[in-house]
Amino acid sequence: MSIKVLIVDDSAVVRQVLSQVFTAASGIEVMDVANDPYMAMDKMKARWPDVIVLDVEMPRMDGITFLKQLMASRPTPVVICSSLTQKGTDISMQAMAAGAVEVIAKPVSGVKGFLEESSHELVMAVRSAAAARMNRVRVMPSASGNPLETRPKLSADAILSAPTGSNVFATTERIIAIGTSTGGTQALEAVLTQLPRTCPGLAIVQHMPEKFTRSFADRLNSLSQIEVKEADNGDRILPGRALIAPGGKHMMVKRSGAYYQVEVVDGPLVSRHKPSVDVLFRSAAKFAGKNALGIIMTGMGDDGAKGLKEMHDCGAKTIAQDEESCVVFGMPKEAIKLGAADEVMPLELIAKAICR
């Protein structure tokens, strides 16, 4: 059965481009379009969508207000479609905290360029959103021959060779590597806001487009006791600090003398993502070994499953979020199937596991 999508955006060009992308994808039906939330609500009286693609800055009623009303009355998967301005990315993070499950960037490179560059990400965002279990979404407090289907799926080999065990140096310093996707913004907020300043350093991959991760990190930093920042190349992984991989870049853990740091690099999509959880986890396996803890959380697909198994095989402790607390039980499920997880636990216990 097709995923029914309602597009809500005040730009006719954006509505047209998004409609074109989704119509070309197998298994997705553009149910209708609306130029503001009032029109959307009228259309939803006759037929309810499976996924709503929502702009955040619109006249008459903004997307955040509409989203909050929707989550209070009939929770429905929402994909935020936002501009790459600072204001746009900040508002998008408010929307994710209010219950949206995915965020995508608005067309900026012209219709032709946008269709070539971003169609895959748009379609994957809608499919991930459609798989979301809305009763697991946490509304956080404020402070077919189609080329989309045939894109080659590269492994972490495209970025980093597999661990051999010979690269791991003895050290007492622990690091935490976390990977997550759909539902992860709320899940990470739930975990990071519980951590004390004395917790081990964290390196985190959350699937998110370029430009949005800085606003996401800034929001978490304002809510947490620990420091949370978008990673820059060469940043040290320190106790009480969480580094979030920039959207559109891969992030790896590297050993540098007596401490760990991150390397932020460009490269191809790995496991169909950039940043890729598999790349982060492989680097943690290779350079931290048993000194690392790997955690795979809510998200669609299998990115991170193989990498977590590599961490496990190199002596790291590994955790998968349980099905009951996941918004989408995809990535953890695949990791569990591979035998990659030492423990399977609910979201509310993960912060304690990090600190024990």
UniProtKB/Swiss-Prot annotation:
UniProt catalytic activity: [protein]-L-glutamate 5-O-methyl ester + H2O = L-glutamyl-[protein] + methanol + H(+); L-glutaminyl-[protein] + H2O = L-glutamyl-[protein] + NH4(+)
Domain Response regulatory span(s) in chain numbering: 4-121
A GO CC term assigned to this protein in UniProt: cytoplasm
Record's subcellular location: Cytoplasm
Any one GO molecular-function label of the UniProt entry: protein-glutamine glutaminase activity
All copies of domain CheB-type methylesterase, residue ranges: 169-356
Principal cellular location given in the protein's record: cytoplasm
Active site: S181, H207, D303
Description of post-translational modifications: Phosphorylated by CheA. Phosphorylation of the N-terminal regulatory domain activates the methylesterase activity.
Annotated positions of the 4-aspartylphosphate modification: D55
Enzyme class: hydrolase
UniProt-listed Enzyme Commission number(s): 3.1.1.61, 3.5.1.44
Keyword set includes Cytoplasm: yes
Comment text on domains: Contains a C-terminal catalytic domain, and an N-terminal region which modulates catalytic activity.
Family: Belongs to the CheB family.
Cited HAMAP family: CheB_chemtxs
Protein's recorded name: Protein-glutamate methylesterase/protein-glutamine glutaminase 2
